[in-house]
Amino acid sequence: DEMVAASAASEKIELQQSAIKKLQLRIKNTDEDDPAKPQLMERMGDMLWQKARYYELEAYDYLSKANEAGAAGDTAKQQQLLAKKTEDEKIGREAREEMLKLYREILKYHSDYEQIDKIRYYMAFNMAEMGYAGEAYEQYSGIVREHSNSRYLPEAFLGMAEYSFTIEEDMPTALQQYQKVVSVDPNSSAASYAMYKMGWCYFNLGEPKKALAQFEKVIREADKG
């Protein structure tokens, strides 16, 4: 069964790489002023993200198996699996870096692309996941500043709030930004999480009564749902 699974995975990787190479060539042969170019680049970004996720999940699987081998006392197998994990993590990160490079090119050369707010959001989300918190904040704030009607506005305010809360530990600013998430779209998926984090802002600001009231409000809203 493992051999069949490995063969299927190998075939999937080959098909993925072939599709990426074909699209890379198509992008290269498309004129810079062709409206299709940023669309093709966005599609390439999606494919690179899928590639990254595949290898990241494989790396997680290797880690799980390595832990099992370690628990069973098979140190040699554990080290072998951990080496595979490291290799797949590297491939996954390289795919994300390539994706970010593409998105930066779209921003630089195709700033009038109709989906530019989406590109900025994807950039910011991946930057945050990869540890580029400051750059992620710049893109989130860019959405707020330049795309006031964007569907990604709640997520942009949430990304800014998370930076203010976690990195800057600036509770007053974080609280305001979480409040903006809720006011922009109370029904967004980001709003319920923002309401919860508002409770922690109040708690960290030394207002336990407000924090408790906020947490109770979150529970009531969850019960309604």
What is each model feature region?
Residues 1-225:
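Acidic, polar-rich low-complexity tracts and alpha-helical solenoid repeat scaffolds
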